[in-house]
């Protein structure tokens, strides 16, 4: 199995980097198993060659997984069952660890706080930073000893080492862009990289499926997960309905503003600024017989001071596009000075403010440094639709992740950023 994998990736060059080295024969190899085909294949790659391969399953949530259908089986129970089936097939031991409290405090509560303030946070980035590559590492350090194990996950990203210079380890995009998850890993601690193995990032999804079938894995045909499991299994998978159970209603007006007079017109009500995101289609009734109001309307701005949501007509309305953003508290994935030096050549830099987004070219950027923080004002080469405060913006130099941080301000006019 491992030889088959190495033969596949051996044909793929990534100069000036070399792939992460393999463990020694009797090293501890710990595979974070989620029950999906990707982590199952990751486990299979090592289980046959390294006798000290073990699995670990993280349970980070145990609230009712179907708030409108309490009789439905929680997703974590199904996942744990599938993990055990794979572990039995591979003849490896698997531990189950519970990080519900950590997830709630470090990921879920900050997410709720962000939504209540009208921003759009990304809990997956926080989960990777604080739980999967934070709390799990602490647990593994205590169990196996710091530096005495390798951590393997099924993420679509790559850990590569510089062939020259300092020999630093870096996080790179997956070779298979349709599944790339480097955006979600952009805030993990760089000290993790030297003992982190991401074998799936060197493969395409069809290759992963083929390897799963070759190994006879019970999860070979399991569909890919879509988003947050406890949201998909509740309230028909509608995130807005899910949030209603945790955020108080804070009704306000949905308005338009006349571009000439500045006069406001109210067209409906919202449950709270958290109930809509920038760029989202608004399903309210507009007078379609009037040419001025025909068409589809979208959220262009959340007005926190007045608790109003401003809408505009047309998916490509200019008001939905911005060319300037500010990132506060940028977190470098590597030495801080190394990241700062990379900003000297903005022509090589791109960014993503969504996962799987086509990389966005940067026109210029301005760094504001302090002892503790790195704030960046970025001017884009072209305007982008629905850049939203609270989103994480990840910066890249070629395919290498420099780091990321939350977007604090967005502006159409780059002179007022």
Curated annotation (Swiss-Prot):
Marked site positions, Interaction with tRNA: 155, 281, 391
Signal peptide boundaries: none
Segments of this protein annotated with the region Interaction with tRNA: 179-181, 354-355
Broad EC category: transferase
CDD domains per the UniProt record, alphabetical: MnmA_TRMU-like (cd01998)
Reactions accelerated catalytically: 5-taurinomethyluridine(34) in tRNA + S-sulfanyl-L-cysteinyl-[protein] + AH2 + ATP = 5-taurinomethyl-2-thiouridine(34) in tRNA + L-cysteinyl-[protein] + A + AMP + diphosphate + H(+)
UniProt superkingdom: Eukaryota
Any Gene Ontology biological process: tRNA wobble position uridine thiolation
Cysteines paired by S-S bonds: 127-229
Major location (coarse): mitochondrion
Protein localization: Mitochondrion
GO cellular component labels: mitochondrial matrix; mitochondrion
MF terms in GO: ATP binding; sulfurtransferase activity; tRNA binding; tRNA-5-taurinomethyluridine 2-sulfurtransferase
Keywords: ATP-binding, Disulfide bond, Mitochondrion, Nucleotide-binding, RNA-binding, Transferase, tRNA processing, tRNA-binding
Record-annotated active site: 127 (nucleophile), 229 (cysteine persulfide intermediate)
UniProt cross-references to Pfam families, sorted A to Z: tRNA_Me_trans (PF03054), tRNA_Me_trans_C (PF20258), tRNA_Me_trans_M (PF20259)
Family: Belongs to the MnmA/TRMU family.
Biological function: Catalyzes the 2-thiolation of uridine at the wobble position (U34) of mitochondrial tRNA(Lys), tRNA(Glu) and tRNA(Gln). Required for the formation of 5-taurinomethyl-2-thiouridine (tm5s2U) of mitochondrial tRNA(Lys), tRNA(Glu), and tRNA(Gln) at the wobble position. ATP is required to activate the C2 atom of the wobble base.
Additional facts recorded: Present with 1510 molecules/cell in log phase SD medium. During the reaction, ATP is used to activate the C2 atom of U34 by adenylation. After this, the persulfide sulfur on the catalytic cysteine is transferred to the C2 atom of the wobble base (U34) of mitochondrial tRNA(Lys), tRNA(Glu) and tRNA(Gln). The reaction probably involves hydrogen sulfide that is generated from the persulfide intermediate and that acts as a nucleophile towards the activated C2 atom on U34. Subsequently, a transient disulfide bond is formed between the two active site cysteine residues.
Protein name (record): Mitochondrial tRNA-specific 2-thiouridylase 1
